[in-house]
């Protein structure tokens, strides 16, 4: 921690400043333009490959197990967004046929795919793989692919899927002991899955890994599908790099790195988060709006967390609630910079959406931002006054400061088919949204505990839990882990049909939970310190294209 003396009003204020590392990326993403000739060439070939793949998907002279494997491969290769309607119709048919399989591998794959697409298939299909004592048969220990599919299936479980608790424990133990003796690329796939299960992974990260590290090395691979996936990944990457260049220029023009040096400079990492919410080309506008929002709220977070005084933060909170540029004169100079930038950003959003007659929806995101800032202010007051809230009071405030209610709402702004009732549904904090927010809160709190403790924070989630329950740090962290597991079950339940809104609008909520799982893996704060966790992912998704 460093100290900074700043002349403010007529007195000198000594501020505790979190010593954040500079951006890892410099200006490397500033200038990128798509090579239209290459993009056009890729797009033409993709169209032809798309038709071949569609024909393959719709072919009827094939075993059901092979159809499930084909869908799984297409999804893992990241090209399923081209065939959403076809895949949904096939899975709907399979679900309504009540098909069952004798082998664990296909049964588990069927279960996971159907659940991930919202079909509430019964976990009783696994009872045939248990002995008379209700334990999974030890003879399954040699079925590595079956175990891997069982392991992946166990992560889509809900509260009533007790059999899948046993499935997770059983498959994990056997996969861990067998992994060192497996051949490549199965060994890499199992090792990766044990560290990062598919259901909780960021889709683009999982796609890149599967294409380059697994599918390309499989003897049974389909060369046409592999080529399609590589071309599609690289073409999308061009679009993503173009978006990042646009956002990087916007960020550079704001010049926060110079004018607000106390804050984290993480616009590239913010883009990774937006890309994690949706990667498909039709969400380009939505992604750019979301990354700008994440970057801006990160500045606000650091203002509350690492710089502002009580008096300043109260004035800032009040100004945000009033949402009026005339309030700017009440703020110290450094706060004027971010306040004006925030109001300008939302004016830009309104202007951008007005051509489609949708500018009125921006108010939903503004109200959520006001909520975040109010709760940030409560947190900073607790810190300054040394208040130690009970864990229930802490959580009622801290769920909003994850920013996930706000980001979920913002993620809808650029989604062209969103309607007013979707925002109304979201504003009521439905259980699936609450689950995603809880996952973010408890995982973030666990990963950042030591750093916040070193800054003198006593109102952290882990500290509150330790005091309330009279438990050790490890026991408190275990409690938080249990909360995350419960929330994942709620989230998985919320994806099952019938759903109150279109699955298209549930996916960003699911993906926000996935991003936090990946960013804070192994209890590391990958956002504040991206070099270990996010840097390799950013290189894979935004720097290096796939060799074709």
Curated annotation (Swiss-Prot):
Lineage top rank: taxon: Eukaryota
Which is an annotated Pfam family here?
Terpene_synth
The cellular location(s) given in this protein's UniProt record come to: Cytoplasm
Find motif (DDXXD motif) and give its ranges: 301-305
Query: Which GO-annotated molecular functions does the record name?
Result: 5-epi-aristolochene synthase activity; magnesium ion binding; terpene synthase activity
Q: Name one GO cellular component term.
A: cytoplasm
Q: What are the binding positions for Mg(2+) 2 in this chain?
A: 301, 305
Q: In what pathway does it function?
A: Secondary metabolite biosynthesis; terpenoid biosynthesis
**Keyword Metal-binding found:** yes
Record keywords: Cytoplasm, Lyase, Magnesium, Metal-binding, Plant defense
Main subcellular localisation: cytoplasm
- Per the entry's comment, what about the domains? The Asp-Asp-Xaa-Xaa-Asp/Glu (DDXXD/E) motif is important for the catalytic activity, presumably through binding to Mg(2+).
What is the similarity comment for this entry? Belongs to the terpene synthase family.
This chain's protein is named: 5-epi-aristolochene synthase 2
* Annotated organism of origin: Nicotiana attenuata (Coyote tobacco)
């Amino acid at each position: 921690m460093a100290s900074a003396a700043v002349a403010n009003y007529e007195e000198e204020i000594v501020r505790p400043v979190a010593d954040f590392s500079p951006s890892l990326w410099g200006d490397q993403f500033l200038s990128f333009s798509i090579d239209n000739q290459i993009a056009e060439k890729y797009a033409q070939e993709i169209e032809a490959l798309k038709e071949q793949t569609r024909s393959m998907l719709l072919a009827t002279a094939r075993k059901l197990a092979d159809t499930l494997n084909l869908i799984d491969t297409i999804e893992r290769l990241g090209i399923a967004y081209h065939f959403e309607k076809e895949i949904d119709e096939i899975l709907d048919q399979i679900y309504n046929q009540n098909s069952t399989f004798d082998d664990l591998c296909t049964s588990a794959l069927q279960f996971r795919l159907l659940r991930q697409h919202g079909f509430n298939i019964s976990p009783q299909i696994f009872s045939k793989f248990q002995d008379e004592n209700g334990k999974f048969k030890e003879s399954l220990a040699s079925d590595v692919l079956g175990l891997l599919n069982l392991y992946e299936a166990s992560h889509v479980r809900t509260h009533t899927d007790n059999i899948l608790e046993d499935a997770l424990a059983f498959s994990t133990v056997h996969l861990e002991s067998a992994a060192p003796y497996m051949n490549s690329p199965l060994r890499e796939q199992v090792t990766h899955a044990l560290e990062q299960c598919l259901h909780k992974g960021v889709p683009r990260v999982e796609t890149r890994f599967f294409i380059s590290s697994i599918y390309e090395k499989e003897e049974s691979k389909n060369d046409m599908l592999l080529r399609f996936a590589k071309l599609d990944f690289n073409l999308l990457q061009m679009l993503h790099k173009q978006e990042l260049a646009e956002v990087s220029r916007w960020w550079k023009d704001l010049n926060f790195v110079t004018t607000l040096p106390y804050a984290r400079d993480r616009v590239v990492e913010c883009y990774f988060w937006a890309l994690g919410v949706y990667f498909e080309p039709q969400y380009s506008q939505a992604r750019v709006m979301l990354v700008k929002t994440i970057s801006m709220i990160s500045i606000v977070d650091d203002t509350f967390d690492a710089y502002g005084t009580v008096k300043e933060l109260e004035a800032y909170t009040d100004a945000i609630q009033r949402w009026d540029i005339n309030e700017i004169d009440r703020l110290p100079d450094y706060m004027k910079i971010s306040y004006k930038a925030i109001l300008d950003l939302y004016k830009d959003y309104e202007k951008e959406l007005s051509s489609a007659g949708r500018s009125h929806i921006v108010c939903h995101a503004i109200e959520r931002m006001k909520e975040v800032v109010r709760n940030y202010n409560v947190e900073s007051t607790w810190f300054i006054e040394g208040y130690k809230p009970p864990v229930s009071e802490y959580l009622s405030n801290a769920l909003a400061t994850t920013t996930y209610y706000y980001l979920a709402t913002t993620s809808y702004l650029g989604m062209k088919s969103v309607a007013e009732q979707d925002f109304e549904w979201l504003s009521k904090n439905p259980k699936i949204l609450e689950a995603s927010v809880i996952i973010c809160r408890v995982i973030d709190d666990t990963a950042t505990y030591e750093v916040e403790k070193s800054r003198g924070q006593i109102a952290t989630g882990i500290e509150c839990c330790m005091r309330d329950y009279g438990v050790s740090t490890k026991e408190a962290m275990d409690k938080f882990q249990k909360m995350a597991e419960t929330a994942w079950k709620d989230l998985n339940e919320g994806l099952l049909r019938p759903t109150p809104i279109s699955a298209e609008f549930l996916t960003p909520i699911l993906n926000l939970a996935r991003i936090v799982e990946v960013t804070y893996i192994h209890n590391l704060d990958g956002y504040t310190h991206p070099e270990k966790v996010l840097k390799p992912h950013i290189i894979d998704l935004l720097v290096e294209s796939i060799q074709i």
